[in-house]
Amino acid sequence: MGLSRRDCIKRAAAAALWGCVAAPLAAQAQTARPVVLIVGDSLSAEYGLKRGSGWVALLEKKLGAEKMEASVVNASISGDTTAGGRSRLPALLAQHKPDVVVIELGGNDALRGLPLDMTERNLAEMVRASKAAGAEVLLLGMQVPPNYGRAYSDDFASLFASVAKDQGAALVPFLLEGVANVANAAELFQPDRIHPRESAQPLMLANVWPVLERLLK
């Protein structure tokens, strides 16, 4: 049975409407940029630094220079611990839907002498939650002075590799490689000897970039 003139008009209008809706959706899908979510503490939150000079800000500039389309969300909070990051993460995952989650936490746990098994559990859960949300994960390792004994500091340094291996995350073994373990380290830190100066930020990015770049390709 043939279509009436009214039916033809309705179908033509519906097709035109769908075309108006589908075209922007297709364009949006083509231009969607990967999202990199940074969940860290003061080392990633520009503590004591001029705004825009931290390693995360330098990462954004690096992505632009490399013509890599990606958005960076810096959800770092000075003083945060792995427990704090773990509690904040679900909402961040839901809000930003990241493609890569970079976890830079644990240093404040160790400076407070918190139980290492708790730190390890928190990091592992953060990796699992991020992967369950469909994101790749990059864990940034940290080391601390032996304030609580050599065994504590050694075990702390090794737990990042353990979590990365067990949970299938990428790893930068030591974020402050070439900063904290060099002869001129004092020149690269602020007077508190905990937070790196602006001059150290490119070195930190240089440690992160090769691993992160692979995750974004």
Language-model segments: residues:
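Membrane-interface segments of envelope glycosyltransferases acting on lipid-linked substrates or membrane lipids
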Residues: 8-11, 32, 40-41, 199
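Alpha-helical cap/lid subdomain in secreted, periplasmic
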Residues: 62-64, 68, 86-217
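Serine-esterase "nucleophile elbow" of acetyl-processing enzymes
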Residues: 28-78, 88-97
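N-terminal secretory signal peptides and thylakoid transit peptides that target proteins
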Residues: 1-17
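Acidic/histidine-rich helix-loop elements
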Residues: 48, 73-82, 111-114, 193
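C-terminal segment of classical bacterial N-terminal signal peptides
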Residues: 20-26
